[in-house]
């Protein structure tokens, strides 16, 4: 199957396994990547050493692309940004904060940036800032405070956006 997302991430199927705290660790992520989709290591509540070890452990289990999810409200986000840039997963998903200042530093390190967006306004901002793709999440997604469902967000966002969703 060939889509904008499969081409961007060099994966076989246009499926991104979500970052679920305490569940999305290296074994799951590598298994998803090895099956032709891509996985995301959830960093919520984790420290820098754990983050580095998880990325390295995942690389030992797969040579396929995978990503990490960084919650921008994390008190140690700057340290985690440095670790992610050093370890170079294929992509990073960004949520729970303003992703715009982080897009260029990650891209300069060769890491694709895929922010999670809960609104058309943020979707336009991250596209204008150069994000590689975006994940649209509505109010039914865990931990999100938006007031629209994913379906209604998609109806508003897709006609306005040219990057992969």
Report each predicted region and the residues it spans.
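Active-site entrance/lid segments in N-terminal catalytic domains of soluble metabolic enzymes
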Residues: 1-164
